[in-house]
Amino acid sequence: MSRRKQPDSPLFPLQAPVPDFTFERAAHRDGFWPVAGADEAGRGPLAGPVVAAAVILDPDAIPAGLNDSKLLTAEQREALFEEILATSTVSIASSSSARIDTTDILKASLDAMRRAVHGLELAARIVLVDGRDVPPGLSCHAKAIVKGDSRSVSIAAASIVAKVTRDRMMARADATFPLYGFAHHAGYATVKHRTAIESHGPCSLHRMSFRPFRQV
């Protein structure tokens, strides 16, 4: 009797990992407390700042539903943003498009994260950072965590704060630069945004070091 071949992949897709408090607990066991999470929003857009946030969660008041901001709806992000601000220690910093053009997007992002961490009213003993790079010049210990916004609740909270803050900034910028539709795409390279750039040229919020502006 022949055996049925096992499928190469599971019958049901695996769920995306949900961030938890594992990294924070490990840091606490190692003697590092408080623990902050840090993340940024806006590395990829053609326009606007990159915004970083640092968050120290209250272990007794962690908002339900924390996750990578990219996996949440705008309504979910807004609700969690308000809850995070009400229950946590939060600091926000940004690097402008001019700063991005003067240095580069990675340096500008890391500098914004450093300033966000240093702006916390409660000094962190260690900061968990999303990605592979740790901001230079931190006054505390740091640990880089790849895909940290889907693994650590502190980083997930920071990703939400950074994303909502930046989206609100770009919505306000739409009133000053109404030709580009910043309220709809937040500066990302959508077809509508590229068409507006072709029609009207770049504005002062555009990152001239990014394509397609290098030849403009």
From Swiss-Prot:
PROSITE patterns xref list: RNASE_H_2
Pfam families documented for this protein: RNase_HII
BP-aspect Gene Ontology terms: DNA replication, removal of RNA primer; mismatch repair
Catalytic activity reported: Endonucleolytic cleavage to 5'-phosphomonoester
The record's free-text note on cofactor binding: Manganese or magnesium. Binds 1 divalent metal ion per monomer in the absence of substrate. May bind a second metal ion after substrate binding.
Keyword Calcium recorded: no
Cellular component, GO annotation: cytoplasm; ribonuclease H2 complex
Top-level lineage group: Bacteria
Main location: cytoplasm
Entry keyword set: Cytoplasm, Endonuclease, Hydrolase, Manganese, Metal-binding, Nuclease
Residues annotated for a divalent metal cation binding in this entry: D39, E40, D130
SUPFAM superfamilies: Ribonuclease H-like (SSF53098)
GO function terms (MF aspect): manganese ion binding; RNA binding; RNA-DNA hybrid ribonuclease activity
Cofactor: Mn(2+); Mg(2+)
Homology family: Belongs to the RNase HII family.
Purpose of the protein: Endonuclease that specifically degrades the RNA of RNA-DNA hybrids.
Name under which the protein is recorded: Ribonuclease HII
Source taxonomy: Bacteria, Pseudomonadati, Pseudomonadota, Alphaproteobacteria, Hyphomicrobiales
